[in-house]
Every structure is written in structure tokens, then in C-alpha cells.
């Protein structure tokens, strides 16, 4: 069954140009998510943790 599906997928006629475009879009989405979500959240967590230091 798996071989049949693989053969069907490989003979579907997908072009390498479409695959490259999709890969570039995926990497761009990861970078945008990092810039818009992860970096500000990390900066906010670091800022809060520095402001709320424990006194020992």
C-alpha cells in the first residue's frame, strides 16, 4: 500500500520549481514567526524576570 502511494505521489508531475517556491515560503514563514512572536515574547520574559529578581 505504501509503495503504491509513493509511486502515485512521484508520478503526480510536481515540479521542482513549485517545491522550491513552497520551501522558500515555509522558511520565510518561520522567520516571520520568529521576528513577530518569539523574539518579543522572549524579550518580555527576560525583562520581567530581571525586574522581579529574588533577594537572597
Curated annotation (Swiss-Prot):
Chief location:
membrane
Annotated TM spans: 27-47
The protein's topology relative to the membrane is: Single-pass membrane protein
**Which Pfam family, any one, appears in the UniProt record?**
PsbX
Offer one example of a GO biological process linked to this entry. photosynthesis
Q: Which InterPro entries match?
A: PSII_PsbX, PSII_PsbX_type_2_subfam
GO CC, one annotated term: photosystem II
tRNA processing listed as a keyword = no
Coiled-coil stretches noted in the UniProt entry, renumbered to this chain: none
Is Lipid metabolism a UniProt keyword of this protein? no
Q: Where in the cell is it found?
A: Cellular thylakoid membrane
Q: What interactions and quaternary structure are annotated?
A: PSII consists of a core antenna complex that captures photons, and an electron transfer chain that converts photonic excitation into a charge separation. PSII forms dimeric complexes.
Question: Which protein are we looking at?
Answer: Photosystem II reaction center X protein
Q: Origin organism of this chain?
A: Prochlorococcus marinus (strain NATL2A)
Amino acid at each position: 500500500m505504501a509503495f503504491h502511494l509513493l509511486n502515485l505521489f512521484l508520478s503526480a508531475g510536481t515540479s521542482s520549481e513549485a517545491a522550491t517556491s513552497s520551501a522558500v515560503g515555509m522558511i520565510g514563514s518561520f522567520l516571520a514567526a520568529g521576528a513577530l512572536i518569539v523574539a518579543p515574547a522572549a524579550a518580555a520574559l527576560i525583562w520581567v524576570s530581571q525586574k522581579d529578581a529574588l533577594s537572597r
